[in-house]
From Swiss-Prot:
It comes from Staphylococcus aureus (strain bovine RF122 / ET3-1). It holds the Pfam family NTP_transferase. GO terms for biological process: enterobacterial common antigen biosynthetic process; UDP-alpha-D-glucose metabolic process. This is UTP--glucose-1-phosphate uridylyltransferase. It is an enzyme of class 2 (transferase). Keywords: Carbohydrate metabolism, Nucleotidyltransferase, Transferase. Belongs to the UDPGP type 2 family. Pathway: Glycolipid metabolism; diglucosyl-diacylglycerol biosynthesis. It comes from the Bacteria. One of its GO terms (molecular function) is UTP:glucose-1-phosphate uridylyltransferase activity.
Length: 288
């Protein structure tokens, strides 16, 4: 069984929920405190043992490449001014993994974005991490899925429970059997209509996929939103070769929409020793 050393991070979306801020800045570069959201995703992959990451980008995404590249002029200035802590942070972001880029030329959905990286992945299993979800956990969420893959040899999809009222916003699994936090899956349903979801176990932006998925994506017809949906291709693959789901442990932060982004920023700030006390005082002063 091949070890998983490669990851795909899709980052080609237009970020329309954050306009006009994302007109000139990639959504993935919006910061949670002092780090862009995409760095949290790359850090999770690196902690899970991933060595090579391909980021699928689109137009106006050059800032992502610049962020993970070295900037010698800035490093020199920080060094001359004795700002060693900032220098270390800047250098750290360039040393997380080997990062490559491919452009998704058309906005045709998540499945199409994954297909764009086929040449990079080759005939190896790989992980996918979506940038809308930051997960805080002792064992990285995607590493939990890798562990299941290493036991089963099959693709594994990360899930967590959501309120039934929200199931229409997610891909949902119809579980067949359960073993602890691990499920065999009868069916995958992409964004079921309100009240029709087979469970409240939602796909949460973390995947381990075998390379066979590319064959299914190649022939996948357009689905929800007239896009090539990854969930639809996984469902077809599951009909031929069992796909597992795993209810990963960890606190998930939804940074793909404005309210979730604000909540995440506040929660991370409250965890920061340098601002917790003053921020707590400020919140109390608001008298909410």
């Amino acid at each position: 069984m091949k070890k998983i050393k490669k990851a795909i991070i899709p980052a080609a979306g237009l970020g329309t929920r954050f306009l006009p801020a994302t007109k000139a800045m990639p959504k993935e570069m919006l910061p949670i405190l002092d780090k862009p959201t995409i760095q949290y995703i790359v850090e999770e992959a690196a902690r899970a043992g991933i060595e090579d990451i391909i980021i699928v980008t689109g137009r106006h995404k050059r800032a992502i490449e610049d962020h993970f590249d070295s900037q010698k002029e800035l490093e020199m200035v920080l060094k001359e001014k004795g700002k060693s802590e900032l220098l270390e942070k800047v250098q750290y972001s360039t040393e997380l993994a080997n990062i490559f880029y491919v452009r998704q030329k058309e906005q045709k959905g998540l499945g199409h974005a994954i297909s764009s990286a086929r040449q990079f992945i080759g005939n190896e299993p790989f992980v996918v991490l979506l940038g809308d979800d930051i997960v805080e956990s002792e064992v990285p969420a995607v590493k939990q899925l890798i562990d299941v893959y290493e036991e089963t040899g099959h693709s594994v999809i990360g899930v967590q429970e959501v309120p039934e009222a929200d199931t229409h916003r997610y891909g949902i699994i119809d579980p067949l059997t359960k073993n602890g936090r691990q499920y065999e899956v009868k069916k995958f349903v992409e964004k079921p209509a309100q009240g029709t979801a087979p469970s409240n176990l939602a796909i949460m932006g973390r995947y381990v996929l075998t390379p066979e998925i590319f064959d299914y994506l190649k022939t996948q017809k357009e689905g929800a939103g007239n896009e090539i949906q990854l969930t639809d291709a996984i469902e077809r693959m599951n009909n031929d070769n069992q796909v597992y789901a795993y209810d990963f442990e960890g606190e998930r932060y939804d940074v793909g929409e404005k309210l979730g982004f604000v909540k995440t920023t506040i929660e991370y700030a409250l965890k920061d020793d340098s601002m917790r006390e003053e921020l707590t005082r400020f919140i109390k002063e608001l008298g909410l």
